[in-house]
Regions:
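Alpha-helical transmembrane segments of integral membrane proteins
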Residues: 2-3, 95, 99-132, 148, ...
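N-terminal signal-anchor/signal peptide hydrophobic helix marking the start
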Residues: 6-12
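Hydrophobic alpha-helical transmembrane segments of membrane transport/permease proteins
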Residues: 16-67, 163-183
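Hydrophobic alpha-helical transmembrane segments of multi-pass integral membrane proteins
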Residues: 17-22, 65, 107-111, 154-155, ...
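Juxtamembrane/transmembrane-helix interface segments of polytopic membrane transporters
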Residues: 19, 23-27, 32, 152, ...
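Membrane-water interface segments at the C-terminal ends of transmembrane alpha-helices
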Residues: 22-29, 59, 74, 138-169, ...
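Short hydrophobic, aromatic-rich alpha-helical segments embedded in or entering the lipid bilayer
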Residues: 46-80, 270-282
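An internal, D/E-rich "acidic patch" concept
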Residues: 60-118
Length: 327
């Protein structure tokens, strides 16, 4: 067990270094000028070359790439993620302020899409070729070909603009202080973004689960169970669910990365102040410190999802736990 966790800790550290290096390399080759992006076009045009060079030096733009990365990595080891150029605040504070909104959004969407996708996949697979199966598959194919931002705009126009049931954006009511915001207010603003992110994430889970159910129903032991007189419901409950659970756990934990990517678009559409919106702001402004910090958080979430899948494997299938212990 000690070797197991030590191996994962080493992998996690190497992953963080690799993600940070890739982010620094991409931002360094970006055509966006951080000075121009942060001071504004009008101020940049009227600024002297000496002032531009002074700002570039102040923000570290004149420091060689490897030196900047080494300084950032060294500070990160001491718990300092740097200072955001766009928000003029420590990166850790910016991320902490927005992480709660993003985690609530992604957590709800992850749970809803996982449960709904698993149930629909099992039902469609158990009723293969029937009307329910055709409707579910058509629904999934339609969603799989629908852009997230377009679906978000459609939901926003119907439920917020036309019907007026929900607010058009943000995470709290406009003009209300943070101390006066209730849990009901925050939940009311969270419904539409979470609905959009959940709906777009259902398709892959449904189709994958359906195929696994079909494979199980065509297996020899299911034929034998039916020959003994077991009903369709008994076959699904006692044979399908047990064998479909492990692949479903794998897919759902791997879906964390897609959830985070989808949240970037959803937060932009609904003006929801989360990590996705901050990542877009950092990318357009050349804010390498904030962008690297958000990339590290997202990589940690994906790594945690894979680790969670391994742990759940051991819970669902003791044979996996034994093999991991021997490794």
């Amino acid at each position: 067990m000690t070797k197991y966790f030590a191996r994962h800790i080493v992998r996690f550290v190497l992953l963080m270094l690799a993600v940070g290096l890739v982010v620094f390399a991409l931002v360094s080759t970006s055509p966006i000028d951080p000075v121009q992006a942060n001071v504004g076009q009008a101020a940049y045009v009227n600024m002297s070359e000496a002032k531009r060079a002074q700002l570039a030096s102040y923000w570290g733009g004149d420091v060689p790439f490897w030196e900047r990365f080494a300084n950032w990595a060294g500070a990160l080891l001491h718990g300092d993620m740097g200072t955001s150029l766009r928000f003029n605040a420590p990166v850790s504070e910016v991320i902490a302020h927005r992480a709660a909104n993003s985690l609530a959004l992604m957590g709800i969407a992850w749970l809803v899409s996982g449960v709904l996708g698993f149930v629909l996949g099992v039902v469609a697979g158990a009723r293969r070729g029937g009307a329910v199966d055709r409707v579910v598959r058509g629904y999934c194919f339609l969603l799989a070909s629908t852009p997230t931002f377009w679906l978000g705009l459609l939901i926003l126009m119907i439920f917020a603009v036309q019907l007026g049931w929900f607010p058009i954006g943000f995470s709290v009511p406009i003009g209300v202080s943070a101390a006066d915001v209730t849990l009901a207010d925050a939940a009311h603003h969270l419904v539409l973004p979470a609905l959009t992110l959940s709906v777009t994430g259902v398709a892959n889970i449904v189709l994958h689960t359906r195929e696994k159910v079909v494979d199980v129903l065509e297996s020899d032991y299911v034929r034998f169970a039916r020959a003994r007189g077991e009903s369709d419901l008994s076959v699904v409950l006692h044979h399908c669910l047990r064998n479909v659970a492990l692949p479903a756990v794998t897919l759902q934990c791997a879906f964390i990365s897609e959830i985070f990517g989808g949240s970037v678009l959803v937060e932009q559409v609904f003006s929801y102040p989360g990590l996705g919106q901050a990542a877009v702001t950092a990318g357009l402004g050349g804010d390498v410190a904030l962008l690297a910090g958000i990339a590290l958080v997202s990589a940690a979430l994906v790594f945690g999802g894979n680790l969670l899948a391994n742990i759940l494997y051991g819970v669902l299938d003791p044979r996996m736990r034994v093999s991991e212990g021997r490794a």
